[in-house]
Amino acid sequence: KMPKHRIFTTEFSKVYPLYVQKAGRKNRTKDEVDQIIRWLTGYSQAGLEKQIKQQSDLETFFARAPAIHPNTSLIKGVVCGVRVEEIEDPLMRRIRYLDKLIDELANGKAMDKILR
């Protein structure tokens, strides 16, 4: 069995502030980041904050997500040199979907376009 990719065992609470910072550098807000995460995962704001507080790793964070949005298949493009829609591993694909949506936010895309 292959060892888990280290990103799977990374705490969500460690990557979350990086998303907020990335957005903030382009004058986008924490609220917008949270809205994107809630859209993708189905977490409520309270549920999202609980996952951060519990220091869940990314694997757990996505495993516990109440409802991965059905329109994730519409998220396309390249993150870290890889086409998100071609990523085989479902967990890695979800992590990269989130990266991609945050990139779109930081690149000035309108929220109604990001939340497909």
Give the ranges of each region predicted by the language model.
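A charge-rich, low-complexity, intrinsically flexible signal that marks solvent-exposed coils, linkers
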Residues: 2-116
